[in-house]
């Protein structure tokens, strides 16, 4: 796996699924392929994206700044600086300085990542802030190792949180989660179906599913009533794909 492929994988792992994730993936691919060279426009676009947390925007801004060639004197962006200040905690800053000194001795991406993984997310963000604000310099490879270590920690925390939700025994949370997933799947079906004639059936199924979820929420239904809703939708989607001559069995 190439270095930039690895960076793209880690960065995308912390972004919530949805159209915005696909858009960011495209931007990263373009940047890494050297196709997008307007850092100013890229940062302005990133700043105005909804949904993303300030830290995620800070990490993306840091990656773009590292990989898009730009003039030396280009102004640093406030939204990135604020996100990478370790919540203003002096402990984070102290640890960030210690980490920075260790990173200065590292030569490789993987070496930097290994060193960084033993620090807290706050310290890692502060260390990125040091480098972003030009208070310290490391090689691009080492800086990207720091990025990936930070993303790995965030993704681990997200995974723990998702797992807790998936394994919760609270029937109300499970019920709502199934309805949200069914609704999201229906939305994806509508986007994939597009405007072809054969798509009418898939669109109809998706539309009915969304109306059903809306009705269930409006009148309040028994928590078990949502069981299998998403799976039924996915079966319909796969049947539609089969008729279209597409074989994709990887949705479950």
From Swiss-Prot:
Q: Could you list the residue ranges that cross the membrane?
A: none
Q: Which Pfam families match?
A: Flu_M1, Flu_M1_C
> What membrane topology does this protein have?
Peripheral membrane protein
What's in the keyword line of the UniProt record? Host nucleus, Membrane, RNA-binding, Viral matrix protein, Virion
Q: Show the SUPFAM superfamilies listed in the entry.
A: Influenza virus matrix protein M1 (SSF48145)
Compartments in which it is found: Virion membrane; Host nucleus
Q: Which domain of life is it from?
A: Viruses
User: Which Gene Ontology biological process is one annotated for this entry?
Assistant: viral budding from plasma membrane
Q: Name one molecular function that GO assigns to this entry.
A: structural constituent of virion
- List the ranges annotated as motif Nuclear localization signal: 101-105
Q: What is its main location?
A: virion
Q: What is this protein called?
A: Matrix protein 1
Question: In which organism is this protein found?
Answer: Influenza A virus (strain A/Chicken/Hong Kong/37.4/2002 H5N1 genotype X2)
């Amino acid at each position: 796996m190439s270095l930039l492929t690895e960076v793209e994988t880690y960065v995308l792992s912390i972004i919530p699924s949805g159209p915005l994730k696909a858009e960011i993936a495209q931007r990263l691919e373009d940047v890494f392929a050297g196709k997008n060279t307007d850092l100013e426009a890229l940062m302005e676009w990133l700043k105005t994206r909804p949904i993303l947390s300030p830290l995620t925007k800070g990490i993306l801004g840091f990656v773009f700044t590292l990989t898009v060639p730009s003039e030396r004197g280009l102004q640093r962006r406030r939204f990135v600086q604020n996100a990478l200040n370790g919540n203003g905690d002096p402990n984070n800053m102290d640890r960030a300085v210690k980490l920075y000194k260790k990173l200065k001795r590292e030569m490789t991406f993987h070496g930097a990542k290994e060193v960084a993984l033993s620090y807290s997310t706050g310290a890692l963000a502060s260390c990125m802030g040091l480098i972003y604000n030009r208070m310290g310099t490391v090689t691009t490879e080492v800086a990207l190792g720091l990025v990936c270590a930070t993303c790995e920690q965030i993704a681990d925390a997200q995974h723990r949180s998702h797992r807790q939700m998936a394994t919760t025994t609270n029937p109300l949370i499970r019920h709502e989660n199934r309805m949200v997933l069914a609704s999201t799947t229906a939305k994806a079906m509508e986007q994939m179906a597009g405007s072809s004639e054969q798509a009418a059936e898939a669109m109809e199924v998706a539309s009915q599913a969304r109306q059903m979820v809306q009705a269930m929420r409006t009148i309040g239904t028994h928590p078990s009533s949502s069981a299998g809703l998403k799976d039924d939708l996915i079966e319909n989607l796969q049947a539609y794909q089969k008729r279209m001559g597409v074989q994709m069995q990887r949705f479950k």
